[in-house]
């Protein structure tokens, strides 16, 4: 889990993203797909589709809203070790079942702080705190065999 201070920094930087969650969720997913062109293939709805087709797809909002909601749960529980352990266990098993591994979350971790900063200037320490949060997800994926 994150320390209380780390969780607070993550929550403060997440606030502006979540305030416009629909558009920001869509924009993040498109940015991920542009940065890592193999990423759409991990989503049944987007496998083999072009960025233009994904952007025009009514499924984009469905997928991005699920991701934003799940990330919001992690942000809300970041300092609660018990909740985080249970959530990470379930999340990692679920995603391993989808064929998603730690590398995909390393990709997200590499670009997410910059995405957050593109929406609103994050508080000091936000990049490191997001890195720690995604590090927990990456470690859970590795434990799940991915």
UniProtKB/Swiss-Prot annotation:
Heme b binds at residue 95. It comes from the Eukaryota. GO terms for molecular function: heme binding; iron ion binding; oxidoreductase activity; oxygen binding; oxygen carrier activity. Signal peptide: none annotated. Keywords: Acetylation, Heme, Iron, Metal-binding, Muscle protein, Oxygen transport, Transport. The modification N-acetylalanine is found at residue 1. Belongs to the globin family. This is Globin.
